[in-house]
Amino acid sequence: MGYDYALVHVKYTIPLAALLTVFSYPVFTRLDVVRTLFIVTIAFVATIPWDSYLIRTNVWTYPPDAVLGPTLYDIPAEELFFFIIQTYITAQLYIILNKPVLHAQYLNSPATLPQWIKSGKLVGQLALSGSVLLGTWLIAKKGEGTYLGLILVWACTFALFTWTITAHFLLALPLACTALPILLPTVYLWIVDEMALGRGTWAIESGTKLELQLFGSLEIEEATFFLVTNMLIVFGIAAFDKAVAVCDAFPEKFDKPADALAMSLLRARVFPSSKYDMQRILGIRQAAARLAKKSRSFHLASSVFPGRLRIDLTLLYSYCRLADDLVDDAATPEEAAVWISKLDRHLSLLYKDPDATSTPLASKYAAENFPPSALSALDMLPTSLLPREPLAELLKGFEMDLSFSNSAFPIADPEDLELYAARVASTVGQACLELVFCHCQHGLPDYMKAYLRNTARQMGLALQFVNISRDIAVDAKIGRVYLPTTWLKEEGLTPEDVLKSPNSEGVGKVRRRILAKALDHYGEARDSMKWIPSEARGPMIVAVESYMEIGRVLMRNGGSAAADGSGRATVPKSRRIWVAWSTLMAA
C-alpha cells in the first residue's frame, strides 16, 4: 500500500479540475452536465476492458507500494479515477472554449460543404484506418511494439467511428474550439506523466515498449495515449454538440429544443445533412458574423444564452443592425428616407396576416427592393415570436436621425433625448424580452410580464445613454449631436460647437450628465431583472452589465473616453470577461 499515485491526483489533476470547475461554473448549464456525464460515462466504460487487459498481460504494472490497493478488474482505484478526471478536465476545457461559438452556423449540407472539409475528412479516415492497421501489425508481431499497437487499435477504432460521423462539423469549427482542448490537456498530462514515470509510480513492462522517449522519462507510448484519448474525448463531445446544433437550428423539424433533453436530441443526431435548410444556416451564419463585428459586448453576452433563444436574439440583432446600417450608410437623406419606407412596407407584409401566407409576399418584396446581403436578415426575423410595435417604433427612431440632414438638431431637450432613446433602444430591449417569454419556461402572470416589459424599456434608455455618451466624437464626424441643446446652452455651447470640438471640457460635463441619467435608469431597473425567467436571467444581466461597464469606464475617466482609434471608448477584453463571469456568479 502506498500513496504515490493518489498524490499525483492530489497535486496535479484535482487542482486543475477544480480550477476549471470554478471558471466554468457560472456558465455551466443542465445541457453541459449531460455533455459531461455522457462523455465521462463512455470513456470510463470503454477504457476498463482495455486497461484491465494491459494489467493482466503485464504490459502495464503498478508497484504495490505506489497504490492504495482497491481494484476493479485488476485496475487500481487511482487509475479508475484517472479515467474520470482526465475526461472531465478535457470536457471542461472544451465547454469553456466553445461557449463563445454559435455551433449552428457551422452546419453544412453535402451541397454546401467546402472541398477542403471533404478532403480533410478523407485524410483523417485514411490516417486513422492506417493507425488501426499499424497497431494490428505491431500486436501480431509481438515484442517491443505491443503496447503502442494496443493503444492504436483500441483508440483509433473509436476515433475512426466518431470522426466519420462528425468530421464535417469538427473541421468547420474554429481551431481554438477543437485543437486547444486536445493539445493543452495533452501537454499538461505529458508533464505529469513524465514526473510519475521518473518516480516509478507506474511502469511499462520492458519488451512491450519501443524504448523511445518524447522527452525525459516520457515514453512515446504514453505520449501517444494521452494525445489519442484527448482526441477521443473532443470527438465525442463534438458528436453530441452537432446533434444539439441541428436540434436548435431547425425548430420546424424538432418540436423541443436541445436543452429540453427530449427525444428531439436523439432524432437530431441521425437527421440527414442533406435535409438541412441551408438558407436558414447561411442566415444564422451572416447574423452571427454581424453580431461579432458590430458589438463586442453583446457578442460576449450572447455566449451564455440557451441555444434557440441565442439564435433568435442573434437574428433580431442582425435585423436591427441591418436596418440601422441601411439608413446610416445612405448617400443622401432622400435615400435614407426611402430605406425607412421600404423597411416599414416589409414589416407590414410580414405582419399582414396571422398565418404564414404573407411571408412569401414579404420575401418577394425584399428580393426586389433590398440588396442581396440584406435578404437573410429580413427574411429570418422571428416575427412569429415578436409583436410588430417595437420594430415599427424603431423605424420612427431612424426618422429622427434624418432630421440631422436638414441642418437641424432634433434633440432639443432631455425629453427629446428620452424619446429618441426609447425608440431606438427601449424597443430592442422589449423585443428581446418577448423572445425570452417565448423560449423560456415560466409561470409569470400578465401583470408581471407587463412590469418586466417596462423594466426592459427603462434599461434600454440606460444603455442608449451610455451609447450616446461613448460615441459623441464618432457622431460628430457625421454631423450628429445627440446631446440636449438646452444642456449645451447651460455650458455656453451650441450643437455646432460639439461638431467642431467633441472632446472639449464643456462637452465632457454634458457627457457626465447623460451618464448620470444612464446610471439612474439602470439603478431603477436593475433589481427588477431578478424576475426574468431563470434560463435567461444571467445572460440578460451579463448583456446589461457588459454595456454599463463602458459607462463606468467613462465616468472614471471624468467623462472623456479612452478611445480605440475610432473614437469609441473601449473596455479591455479581459475586463469584459471578468464582468461577465462575476455577474453570472452573482446572478
Curated annotation (Swiss-Prot):
Catalysed reactions listed for this entry: all-trans-lycopene = gamma-carotene; gamma-carotene = all-trans-beta-carotene; 2 (2E,6E,10E)-geranylgeranyl diphosphate = 15-cis-phytoene + 2 diphosphate
Residue ranges of the region described as Phytoene synthase: 249-587
Localization in the cell: Membrane
SUPFAM superfamilies recorded: Terpenoid synthases
Membrane topology: Multi-pass membrane protein
EC number(s) from the headed UniProt entry: 5.5.1.19, 2.5.1.32
InterPro entries: Isoprenoid_synthase_dom_sf, Lycopene_cyclase_dom, Squ/phyt_synthse, Squalene/phytoene_synthase_CS, Trans_IPPS_bact-type, Trans_IPPS_HH
Assigned GO CC terms: membrane
Keyword Transmembrane recorded: yes
Pfam families assigned: SQS_PSY
GO biological process: carotenoid biosynthetic process
Stated family: In the N-terminal section; belongs to the lycopene beta-cyclase family.
Name by which UniProt lists this protein: Bifunctional lycopene cyclase/phytoene synthase
Organism: Colletotrichum graminicola (strain M1.001 / M2 / FGSC 10212) (Maize anthracnose fungus)
Phylogenetic placement of the source organism: Eukaryota, Fungi, Dikarya, Ascomycota, Pezizomycotina
